[in-house]
Amino acid sequence: MKAYKGFNKDMTCNPNGNVFQFEEGKTYEEAEAKLCESGFHACEAPLDVLRYYAPHGSVYHEVELDGVSDERKEDSKVCARKIRIGARISILNL
């Protein structure tokens, strides 16, 4: 599934207070995907990433997700077991 992910400026995320470092072009995998608890999170609707990563101090990438959980909340945020970090996109291209 194609989706969009925000990161801190240094390509890190801080899920549950733990720093996770990402790199463009790499693939990452976890054992399970549970929305807001485990796995890799991204948004199907590009502008939804702004709810989680404000434009100042953030970067955005297209990502490819596999093993996506069926769980959903109030927006297009999804969670997957596997994520491939694609190209960086500007805020104007979201």
What are the residue ranges of the model-derived segments?
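Short, glycine-biased loop/turn motifs at secondary-structure junctions and
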Residues: M1-L94
